Structures are given as C-alpha cells and as structure tokens.
Regions:
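Cell-envelope/extracellular polymer assembly enzymes that use nucleotide-activated donors
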Residues: 1-4, 32, 193
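Glycine-rich, basic loop-to-helix element that forms the pyrophosphate-binding segment
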Residues: 63-79, 89-92
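Donor-binding/catalytic cores of nucleotide-activated saccharide
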Residues: 68, 92-209, 214-230
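Short aromatic/hydrophobic "clamp" motif used to bind/position activated sugar donors
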Residues: 84
C-alpha cells in the first residue's frame, strides 16, 4: 500500500464528514484512511463507523481517550502504507494533495515532503501560507543550511514553527529508522516536537512551494483560537523536551531557537488568556529564568514588539488592559 492517512477524531461532529469527504476524493490510488476515535463522547464514533461501512478505504480505531499524541501514535502503529500523512479532522485536503506529494516523494526519494497551505477563517476568507525557502529537493547539506535555522522556531514570532505534520508527508521507513513518534504527555501542539525531530534527521526533504494543497480551518475552540487549562505548563514541558533533544547537538546550535520557541508560546498564552493573574504567572516564570537578561529581541510586527516590551518589563496590568481581561483559568 502506498499511503496511510491518519485522522485523529475527538469532538468534531460539525466537521468530520467534510474532512473525510475530501479524503475520499483524493486522486491517488492504493491508500487507506485511518480514523482514530480517541474516545470521543459525542456521535463521532458512530459517524466513523458509518463512513467506514461505505468504503474499503477507511479503517476505524476506537480507543480510550488519551489525547492527540496518543491518537496519532495509534494510527502510526496500525498504518500499512509506505508513506504517512496526517490530516486534522476539522480540516480539508485538496483533491490532488496526496497524489502530488506521493509523486514528489517517490521521484526524489525524500524522507519528508512539505506543501504550502491555506489558512481559512470562519468568515471563509483564506490566504496562502508560504515560506522563504526555494522549491524543490534539499539534501542534507542544504537542510542544515536552510532548514535548521528555523527548524524549531524562526525569528518572526508572528508566525509559528516551520513544519507541521498536517502539511507534510513522511516515509514510514524513515520514521521507523529513527523511532519517531509523538510524546503522549504533550496533549496539544505536540506536532511541533515531532516535526522538529523529523526535520533534524531528514536526509532528503522536498518542498512544494506555492501549492496550497491543505486547508487549515481556524475553528472555534481550537488551540489556535483558545488556551485549554494548564496550557502554559504544557508548553514549558514541551520546551524541556526540545531542550533535552537539541541542546547538545554538535552539528548545529539551536539555543536561540529554543528561546524563541518558549517566547512564542508565552505570547500565545498571554494573548489567549488575557487575565492579570495568569499573565503574572507566565512573566514570573520567564524572569525567574532570567530569560530577558541577554535576550536579543526578534524582528517582529509593531504590535508584537509592544507586547514583548511589556513582557520584558513585567507590565502585567498594562498587558491585561490592552488585551482585554477574560476569566482566569488554572495553570
């Protein structure tokens, strides 16, 4: 089998059929869709079974709730395809997404293929998310030169990490070779950790530039539009994972990126929570770690520069006022 597409499913009733419809419309052949029901308490398990009954291309895995990492790992364990793709169950793949990515992977013998994607707002407005990288094949020397500088986090904190699993295709042989899987105790944004580790080990990487083959929807309640309780502690734990993995690499210095990664998620938590006590908690952690003592501020938008300046000078009350206070949640 050429391809396994892994779709974690949890509380996505309004979007699940739309997502699976886009996967059943793929122009490639010889592929399977793995719907991993992560103990969803709504009608999603029933919808998964109904969809699977209509085609041999779909397999359903029902499991106890363990989080997004656990669901993706269950899919990885069950996958039969030579290549692995990941699709979030509230998103939509273009009909030719995986045919194009598979062709690129096979002809270039790439470990990872990445495409650009569309970010889609609730209003329906969308725009293409691309990078400064050139299109085409990168071998190891080029990966180190061009991908490593933003592998964990680039200088522009107005954007997130370079790689995410849902717009990449992976060779299963490559993933198995380096024992790459998701950290079960990181319940969200775990693909940042997985993607950075995969990108580090890749020997051949192919970039499909300006081809928006994936539609990433910013739906209400997602991690991009809200912060679950305990978010800051999870992001700190993820950063420690990255530090343990990347701090002592002899082929590249990732220290600056590790700082930027933590700062990016500190900014995210502050913007989403907007409550003075919660903001003070984040700022206290950064200052106790002497984060800003010798930190060179990145080149970002004026709005973010103001937020970073206020964070550096521990202006929690001003941040709360500017962002608009919301109810506090536990960290």
């Amino acid at each position: 089998m050429d391809l396994s597409i892994i779709v974690p499913v949890y509380k996505v009733e309004p979007y699940l059929r739309r997502c699976v419809k886009s996967l059943m419309a793929q122009t490639c052949e010889n592929y399977e869709v793995l719907l991993v029901d992560d103990g969803s308490p709504d009608s999603c398990p029933k919808i998964c079974d109904e969809l699977a009954a209509c085609t041999d291309n779909i397999r359903v895995i029902h499991k106890a709730n363990g989080g997004l990492s656990s669901a993706r790992n269950a899919g990885l364990f069950a996958a039969r395809g030579d290549y692995i793709g990941f699709v979030d169950s509230d998103d939509v793949a273009a009909p030719d997404m995986f045919a194009i990515m598979l062709t690129a992977a096979k002809t270039s013998d790439a470990d990872i293929v990445m495409c650009d994607y569309f970010r889609v707002l609730r209003t329906g407005r969308r725009w293409l998310m691309t990078t400064a990288l050139r299109p085409g094949l990168y071998e190891k020397a080029d990966i180190i030169k061009y991908l490593y500088p933003s592998l964990i986090m680039g200088e522009n904190l107005d954007y997130g990490p370079l790689l995410s699993v849902w717009h990449c295709l992976y060779s299963r042989k490559f993933l198995n070779q380096y024992h790459l899987a998701f950290a079960d105790d990181i319940p969200w944004s775990e693909d940042n950790l997985f993607s950075a580790m995969a990108g580090y080990h890749a020997k051949r990487f192919f970039y499909l530039k300006s081809m928006g083959l994936y539609n990433y929807f910013q739906n209400p309640g997602t991690i991009t539009t809200s912060c679950p309780p305990g978010a800051w502690n999870v992001y700190k734990r993820m950063n420690r994972y990255l530090e343990n993995y990347f701090s002592f690499r002899s082929d590249y210095d990732f220290q600056r990126q590790l700082q930027l990664h933590l700062l990016y998620y500190a900014c995210h938590v502050i913007r989403m929570e907007r409550q003075e006590a919660c903001i003070r908690n984040v700022l206290k952690d950064l200052h106790q770690a002497h984060f800003f003592d010798h930190f060179r501020m990145p080149d970002v938008s004026l709005k973010l520069k103001i937020q970073l300046w206020l964070m550096k000078h521990q202006c929690a009350r001003t941040l709360t006022f500017l962002l608009g206070e919301s109810p506090c949640r536990s960290y």
